[in-house]
């Protein structure tokens, strides 16, 4: 099989922890091997807490300590899982062609003074950055050394309205159409972290059958005649990103917890001084690795 892989500079990991006595189908194991997943047989029935601690440790190692405790310590409530499927991403990039320089504190979007950094490409030998500066939105593409990944900063004039109407197609158009030459960028240092269940979000997006013991169909994963059916009990997601004058470090992880059904249920100058959206994506394919927004960089 041939599946798309993360671009140069992005480290990805995939692992599946499967209940030791669960009759997993050969086709599913083949699929796991196809995507390069580590397959671990564990006994959730005997020591579910120990197994989940091991999973969290694996996630922490793969994200270089950026995502800790992906699956909460007080989980599960009730019946133990019979499979946990985890994927991780890690990125550590240095700015190119020049590092930013810290320039002190200034106002940001009405939240008060925050620490700013600046990049100037004034020399004729310096390559320019791409961007778009308009009354509605400011977009700039920031580059990293030795990687296919770029950071796109999107600062709309009306942040709330822009986010409420944002779609993948609208975002793709924003970061793909960059006609202006950018010779300087001033933006805040920022750090953002997220960790919680995304089950409600997925269900709001229409992913419902997989969470339903009555409707879930994982017959391609396990021999349901011998073992019974499975359903997804919860999905946990954790992400961390930090941007400073040296570059960007980011990590993310997603854990899918599966339970048995028998269980209970011109030279532009850009200043980023208002709330903005950030995207880490492959420059060629526009595959998005990290996306988020910053309202307060502190």
Where are these regions (language model features)?
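Non-catalytic, conformational "gating/processing" segments within enzyme and secreted inhibitor domains
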Residues: 1-159, 176-264
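Composition- and surface-driven signal marking solvent-exposed, interaction-prone regions
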Residues: 99-101, 154-156, 163-171, 255-256, ...
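C-terminal soluble interaction/assembly domains
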Residues: 239, 245-298
């Amino acid at each position: 099989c041939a599946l798309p892989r993360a671009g140069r500079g992005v480290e990805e990991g995939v692992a599946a922890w499967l209940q030791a006595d669960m009759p997993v189908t050969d086709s599913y194991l083949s699929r796991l091997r196809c995507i390069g997943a580590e397959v671990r047989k564990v006994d959730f029935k005997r020591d579910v807490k120990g197994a989940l601690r091991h999973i969290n440790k694996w996630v922490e190692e793969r994200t270089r300590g950026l995502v800790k405790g992906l699956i909460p310590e007080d989980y599960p409530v009730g019946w133990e899982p019979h499979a946990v499927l985890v994927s991780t991403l890690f990125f550590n990039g240095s700015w190119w062609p020049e590092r930013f320089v810290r320039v002190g504190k200034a106002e940001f979007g009405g939240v008060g003074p925050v620490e700013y950094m600046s990049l100037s490409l004034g020399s004729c030998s310096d390559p320019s950055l791409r961007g778009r500066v308009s009354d509605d939105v400011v977009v700039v593409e920031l580059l990293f050394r030795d990687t296919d990944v770029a950071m796109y900063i999107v600062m709309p004039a009306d942040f709330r309205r822009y986010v409420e109407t944002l779609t993948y197609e609208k975002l793709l158009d924003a970061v793909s159409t960059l006609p202006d030459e950018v010779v300087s960028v001033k933006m805040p240092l920022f750090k953002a972290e997220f960790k919680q269940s995304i089950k409600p979000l997925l269900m709001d997006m229409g992913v419902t059958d997989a969470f339903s013991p009555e409707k879930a169909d994982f017959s391609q994963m396990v021999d349901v005649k011998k073992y019974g059916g499975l359903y997804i009990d919860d999905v946990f997601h954790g992400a961390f990103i930090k941007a400073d004058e040296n570059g960007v470090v980011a990590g993310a992880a997603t854990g899918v917890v599966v339970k048995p059904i028998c269980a209970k249920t011109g030279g532009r100058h850009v200043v980023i001084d208002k709330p903005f959206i950030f995207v880490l994506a492959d420059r060629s394919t526009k595959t998005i690795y990290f996306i988020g927004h910053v309202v307060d960089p502190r």
